[in-house]
Swiss-Prot record:
GO molecular function list: beta-agarase activity
Keyword DNA repair: no
Places the protein is found: Secreted
Family of this protein: Belongs to the glycosyl hydrolase 86 family.
Disruption phenotype annotation: Disruption of the gene results in loss of agarase activity.
EC number(s) per entry: 3.2.1.81
Keywords associated with the record: Glycosidase, Hydrolase, Secreted, Signal
Chain's gene name: agrA
Protein name from the UniProt record: Beta-agarase
Length: 505
């Protein structure tokens, strides 16, 4: 039996209310009944409480105190890097003996310099955080699909010879720019675990080809056969990294009576499913009715699983390499706390849904880069999604120093959660409920998916009869025009607790 005394309620819409208020929904937490899915029952923080960044990210320079806070106090992990593959592909030299392909000797030399000098010596202060999370890397349509290199410093550009040449480079890149298993940390950054062939390719080359200077859209089938060529060439050099695609930007499968499904995800599974180790998808709630959290997200993953089983005879795991919330009318404006809230109010419910599939969702990464200077607009407007902003960006603040945006509250909300998953259920299907037990502590997670406040009763069973636990509540909600993370302590809480879940909208 699990011994449970203290417990923590974590949600983005939870407050305590007096016990005389009648509740419309009941939630049950069985603290001594383990909940296992295909043998998976542990909360894997390193796979889900992640930043869209790596230790190699130059944004950490000068912000070592913030890196330490994220790693040591909030227990956050890495991460995803789609920039290193672009920069190093652009600097690669063409092989004079094999036109259209990168020179292997140049890859080896530059990789050694990156591993042993840039990482091993220049970034030795970061080695203490080595191995925090499974790294994901990937290609980009402009650099890798178009394949025309753009070197700095007077280098000569050359045209890659299709997916085979790109996969050949990327397979060697992983082998040479990262250390081998068993090597000391001074020999390079830990090698990635996942490789996405292209990031959101159909958005960039099919839906908005003008953004890449293309006159006509590229049909999806061309992108999918490119995936196959890259994967096959990559595996000539490396077979232990999981390859994924097609990194769907907007999985709106039901559009035009599911014609979009037929033309895209179904076609991808038919064409490239056998070449992939994982399926890669992005999920974002928008400011209108185009939202995924809740049943739509479940249906989207179910459709992929079911058709994969029908077409290939097997399902494949998922990697969710970006997720969160957006308010597009606010995206061309300066930073605001309210815009960050649109991200925050979606992130936790989506994470809870990913956690409910521990056997199939291998990792999920909220889209939170660090400074994201690479995304600054031509008019100087900073990138929307960032962990850090400059002081001068907020009203009534001045200064050039970098401080946390409101997005840090996602990590503060989840900072304590860990342990073994236990049984929970609710009488209301519009509530997400989950719970984990670690030693003598229980962590209870509740999220309200409805558009109105909901009263609930939480019943907990399985704690020792003599225990008089202390309950800490973390409550992330919108107050005025800014997110607020409230922390509250309740002592000697009864086995039946009456609460109010506010609406998220």
């Amino acid at each position: 039996m699990l011994k449970v005394i203290p417990w923590l309620l974590v949600t983005s819409s939870l407050v305590a209310i007096p016990t005389y208020i009648h509740a419309t929904t009941e939630v049950v937490v069985n603290l001594n009944v383990k909940h296992s899915v295909e043998g998976k029952s542990e909360f894997e923080r390193k796979n889900h409480i992640k930043l869209h960044s790596t230790l190699n990210d130059n944004d950490w320079q000068g912000e070592e105190d913030k890196l330490k806070y994220m790693m040591e106090e909030l227990d956050v992990y890495f991460g995803r890097d789609n920039g290193g593959t672009v920069w190093n592909f652009n600097q690669a030299i063409e092989d004079p003996a094999n036109i259209g392909y990168a020179d292997p000797q140049n890859i080896i030399a530059r990789g050694q310099a990156q591993r042993e000098t840039n990482w091993g010596q220049n970034k030795s202060a970061l080695h203490q955080y080595d191995g925090r999370g499974d790294l994901m890397i990937g290609g980009q349509p402009r650099a890798h699909y178009l394949g025309n290199t753009s070197p700095c410093c007077g280098g000569s550009a050359w045209q890659a010879k299709g997916g085979d040449a790109v996969g050949d480079f990327l397979g060697q890149y992983v082998n040479e720019f990262f250390r081998s298993a068993g090597d000391p940390v001074t020999k390079g950054h830990l090698a990635p675990v996942y490789f996405e062939v292209l990031n959101e390719p159909l958005y960039q080359v099919t839906d908005a080809p003008h953004e890449l200077g293309l006159e006509q859209p590229i049909p999806p089938i061309d992108i999918f056969t490119f995936h196959n060529d890259v994967a096959d060439a990559f595996r000539q050099h490396n077979t232990h990294i999981k390859i994924g695609g097609f990194t769907v930007a907007f999985p709106i499968f039901e559009q035009r009576e599911f014609a979009r499904w037929e033309e895209r995800m179904k076609l991808f599974i038919d064409t490239s499913g056998s070449h992939m180790d994982v399926y890669s998808t992005h999920f974002y709630d928008l400011e209108d009715d185009n939202r995924f959290k809740g049943s739509r997200l479940e249906a989207t993953l179910d459709m992929i699983d079911q058709y994969s089983l029908l077409a290939l005879g097997e399902t494949k795991p998922h990697v969710i390499s970006e997720y969160g919330g957006r308010n597009r009318p606010m995206e061309n404006a300066p930073w605001s706390a309210l815009r960050d809230w649109w991200f925050l109010k979606t992130a936790s419910p989506m994470l809870m849904q990913f956690l409910s599939r521990p056997d199939s969702v291998l990792t999920s990464i909220p889209f939170v880069p660090i400074k994201a200077l690479w995304g600054t607009a031509a008019d100087g407007t900073p990138y929307n999604w960032r962990l850090l902003r400059q002081q001068k960006e907020a009203p009534n603040e001045t200064g050039e120093n970098w401080v946390f945006t409101e997005m840090v509250k996602f990590y503060q909300l989840w900072s304590d959660v860990k342990g073994t998953r236990v049984d929970t259920f609710s009488t209301n299907s519009d509530f997400l409920i989950d719970s984990y037990v670690q030693n003598d502590k229980a962590y209870v997670l509740i999220s309200n998916l409805t558009e109105q406040a909901e009263k609930i009763v939480v019943h907990k069973y399985g704690a020792p009869a003599s225990s008089q636990p202390t309950t800490r509540i973390k409550h992330l909600y919108l107050k005025g025009a800014a997110p607020r993370l409230m922390k509250q302590v309740m002592r000697q809480i009864s086995k039946k607790s009456r609460l109010l879940l506010k609406r998220l909208w």
